[in-house]
Each structure stands twice: as structure tokens, then as C-alpha cells.
Amino acid sequence: FVNASQLTDATFQTAINDILAQDPNGDYDLSPYGKIQDWDVSQVTNMSNAFFNKSSFNGDISAWDTSSVTNMNTMFRDASVFNQNLNSWDVSSVTNMFSMFRDASVFNGDITSWNTGSVTGMGDMFYDANSFNQDIGSWDVSSVTKMNQMFRSSSIFNQDIGSWDTSSVTNMVGMFYGAGSFNQDISSWDTSNVFTMQYMFLGANLFNQPLDSWDVSSVFSFESMFQDANVFNQDLNSWNTSSATQMKSIFYKARDFNGNISSWDVSNITDMSKMFRQAFDFNQDISSWDTSNVTRMYETFYDARVFNQDIGSWDVSGVNFMQSMFNGANDFDGDITSWDVSSVTSMAFMFQFSPFNQDISGWDVSSVGT
């Protein structure tokens, strides 16, 4: 036999491929490297893709010495039957855990005690890990910069991670997208360095926790942040949204949302399309909003069934698209007669299925094509 201590970055992946070709769990006495559970991997630094798409692997590798490993990117992605206890692993040198358990659909191994203090990337880590629900609240995530899609479609995860130090995180895109069970208090998170929160709670059907203390002053995109977050209904009025340029679909299908957002600074927003579409309960005073930079308002209040606030003072002079803006807005009959719509090119179905009955004969619609 080749001495297992000779496994290095150069031989590690070849050894895995060879032994799993003989036995799906690496329990093969005649392997030149010995049984997989006995391997000495102490010299290996890169374990990225190690068991990627190894759909039959469920070997016991709990005794591996992983103290030299820095990269575990995609290590168990699509390892669809893997479910072992890895809590004894030394991951203190690992910096990259991107997609580590993505699509590892039955994995719920104990990893609660991992020292993750060196990790900077956890994006996609538990994406579609539909069985994972371990208590990882004590993890040190203070160095992590990317948590994008970390728990996306992780359908049963609902652990207390409210004490995490997220002060280094810049990217939270889709972090809880489709995390249908998650409803934990994360109000104390430091989000001051996060620049994008788009899709963050999209489809997080049970999430309804206070977020008013979050510092979102660096966020430029809130696109679809609470889309399909059916029960979310919190006061967000304290948010500093002055850096944001994108709010498309932020409350689309957030059916219970009626939180106070009257003081939001939307002066840099360019896209408000579908912003309150099917936000059935929304009826807050947003009359003072500075909409002077908005160019897209199509479907903004589409099917916003109870909205009927005074938005007559809005500056819509830069808006190009207003199609279906109030379509199905069952209560809206606000006075918007003074709006400057001279830049609008599309107004199709703007007031369809709404009771709107104001005299807008003075509108300049010379640019409207549809």
C-alpha cells in the first residue's frame, strides 16, 4: 500500500475518485491508499469539490485531520445521501465554505462546535440542504463577508443565530430565500457594511421579526427583499435608505405588510416597479416621498387592494413606464391630476379594475405609445 500520509493536494482528489469507483463509501481494503476513514489528510489544504456529485457517498470521515485545509468550497455539493457527524473536524484554517453542503439533501450532521473564525465566504453554504437544522448559533462568523443565499431553500432550518457577529458581511442577497421555516430574532445583527439585500427574505413564509434597528445605510438594492414573505409586518420607518437605487418588488406579495415606511429617503430610487403589487393590506402615508429620480413605476400598486393615500405631490416627471400602475387597486381614487406625465411612454391598463375617477384631461400624454 502507498502510505496514506502521502496524500497531498496533488493526490487527494485522485484517491477519492479511485476508491469510490470501487466502493461508494470508500470502505475498500485493497485501495492503494487504504480505507477512506483511515486516510491521513493532514497535508491537504484544498478539499474543494471533494465529494461534489458523489451521490452514493456516506462514508465515515469524522476522524480526518483537516487542520491544514483552507478551502472546502463545494465539498459535499450534491452528495445527496451524505449524513455524517463532522463536529470533531478542525476547520480553523478554512477560509472558503462556499456551497459546501449545497443540495446535500439529507445532511443534518453535527457541526455545531466548528471554529469558523477564519471563514470569509459562506455563500450558498446550505442552499437546498433541506434536512439541515443544527444549532450553529455559536459560530464565529466575524470574518465572513459573503452570506448570499446561505440558507436559500433550506426548508426546515430555524435555529437561533441572532448573536452572530455580521459586521464584516457585505452581501446578503437571497440569504433566507425560500427558507420557509425560519423565524428567528436577528434584530441585533450589524448590517452596516451590507450593500445588497435583494431577495433576502423572498418566500420566507413564516418570517416576521423586528428589523427596525438594522443599519441599512450602505444598501443600494432592496429588490424583492420581502417578496412573498406573506406574514411579514414590521415597522421599518427608522431605516436610512438614502443609498438605495433599487426597490423593485420589495413588498410584492407581502400580503400582510402594512408597516410604517413614511420617512424613507427614496430620493435616489430609479425603479419602483411592482413595489407594492399584491401587498393587500398596505395603506401607509408615503405622500412625502421624493420620487424625482424614479423612471419605472409599472405595476407599482397593482392589486394593492386597500391603498388610497394622497400621492398627488409626487414628482413623476422622470417616469417612463406606468403600465398597470393602479390595476386592481380597488380603493384608489386619489387626486393625481397635477402629475407631470410628459415623459411617460406606456400607460396601458394603468387604471384597469380600479374605481379611479379623477379628471386627468390636463395630462400631457404626447409621449405615450401604449
Model feature map: region roles:
Residues 1-370:
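Negatively charged
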